[in-house]
A protein has these predicted regions:
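Short glycine-enriched loops at secondary-structure junctions
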Residues: 23, 82-88, 138-139, 178
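Short beta-strand segments
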Residues: 18, 83, 132-138, 173
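A glycine- and small-aliphatic-rich helix-loop capping segment at beta-alpha/alpha-beta transitions
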Residues: 33-36, 92-102, 124-126, 147-156
Length: 216
C-alpha cells in the first residue's frame, strides 16, 4: 500500500517501466537526442491534411511502438493515460479511437508526460490495473496555432518564444518486476506557482519556478 511522507507518495509495488518509445520530427532528429528516438520523420505532416491529424499520427505510432516493444498485446493493456496540447485532448482521443483500449485524458501542458506517469503508477499501486500506458504528444505547428499564431498568418516570433517539440513519447508500465528496467517508487505532485510572468509568448519562464521549487 502506498504511504505518504510529506507531499511525496511512496509506492510499495514500484511499478516497472517495461518498454518505451519515442518518435519525433526532422528538427528534433538533428538535435543532441536525435539518435535516441525510435523513429524520426522528414515529413512532419505525417501524410495528413492538417497539423492536428499529424500530431494524432505521432501519438498513435509511439503507443503502438511501445506496446510492441513490451511484447504485450493491445488486449493486455488495461488503460492508457495520455494527453497533448490540443483542445479536448483530441490528439490522444483520435490516436486511441481504433485501439479499443480504455483511456483517460490528461492535461498538464509541458508536465503531461510526468503527470501521466504519476497517474499510471498510482493505478498499478491501487491493484486495479496490471499493465497500462502513459503517453503524450505535441507538434510545433499545431502548438503555434493553439497558443500563438497559425503559421499561415505569418506573424513574427518573439525572441522569448520557445520551440515546441514535434514528437510523441509513450511508456508501458506494469506490476511485473524486472531487474534491468526502471521503476517508479515515489511520486511528487507539484503546486501552482504564479510569478506574474506577463509575456504570453514566454511560456518557459512561467513554468520554470515549479521545476525548481521542491518541498519535502
Amino acid at each position: 500500500m502506498a504511504q505518504r511522507k510529506g507531499k511525496t507518495v511512496i509506492l510499495e509495488s514500484k511499478p516497472c517501466i517495461i518498454a518505451n518509445a519515442g518518435v519525433a520530427g526532422k528538427k528534433e532528429s538533428e538535435g543532441p537526442l536525435g539518435e535516441e528516438f525510435d523513429e524520426t520523420y522528414e515529413d512532419t505532416t505525417m501524410g495528413q491534411d492538417c497539423w492536428e491529424k499529424s500530431e494524432t499520427e505521432l501519438m498513435k505510432r509511439a503507443i503502438e511502438l511501445a506496446i510492441s516493444k513490451s511484447a504485450k498485446e493491445k488486449t493486455e493493456i488495461d488503460a492508457v493515460f495520455s494527453g497533448d496540447l490540443l483542445n479536448q485532448c483530441i490528439g490522444s482521443t483520435f490516436a486511441l479511437r481504433e485501439m479499443n483500449i480504455p483511456s483517460v485524458g490528461l492535461y498538464g501542458a509541458c508536465s503531461t508526460m510526468a503527470l501521466s506517469l504519476c497517474v499510471a503508477a498510482l493505478s498499478i499501486e491501487s491493484g486495479g490495473f496490471s499493465t497500462v500506458v502513459a503517453a503524450t504528444s505535441s507538434h510545433f505547428c499545431s502548438a503555434e496555432k493553439q497558443f500563438r499564431y497559425p503559421l499561415e498568418y505569418g506573424g513574427q516570433r518573439t525572441p522569448t518564444a520557445q520551440w515546441t517539440v514535434t514528437g510523441s513519447g509513450a511508456a508501458v508500465i506494469s506490476k511485473e518486476r524486472s531487474d534491468i528496467s526502471p521503476y517508479i517508487d515515489k511520486i511528487h505532485i507539484g503546486t501552482i506557482q504564479d510569478y506574474g510572468i506577463l509575456d504570453a509568448a514566454n511560456m518557459g519562464a512561467a513554468m520554470a519556478p515549479v521545476d525548481v521549487k521542491i518541498e519535502p
